[in-house]
Amino acid sequence: MIRLWLGLSLLAFSGALLTECELNSTQRSVDYLPVRPAERQQAGDKPVALPEKQFVLYVHCDKPQRIRLFFGSAYAQNGRFALGNRGEMNITAGQAVADDRDVMLVPVRSAGAPITAEAAKRSRIVLNQGIAFVQGEEIEASQLSVVLNVASMMENQAITDRVTYRGNLQVRVVTP
């Protein structure tokens, strides 16, 4: 069985506004069904692609403010989100909604960094970096949701016993 654990930070505070934000997710962990020998054999020498998983992050703040989400992992390898020692997770954010309006995403490197990239409906999540929410310019909101898609793959190898591969996604809310 392959198991992906999602660890989520639940509170963030803005020092300037003394406003509290709460982070929730539709799922705290994602399990993949056991990968059968036939599936691994069919993949040959190529990595085994696991079914894409999807979950939603929700942020609720006491007052409207700029919200940025930053992503880390306790299981990182070569600057990527690792899945065990022979796999990786590719994470994409999309379908962002802030206070009942669709918004675009922009990758950001740090909490106070200016926005320099183009906005898009989808954004690839980079380890130890984040996303900001824009509609022309960075928006202020008290309610926010964003869908994360997790596409995982693992190196094909002979497995004789039950093996659990662990991945981890840590999400931090920052209100710059």
Set out the residue ranges of the language-model regions.
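Sec-dependent signal peptide recognition
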Residues: 1-8
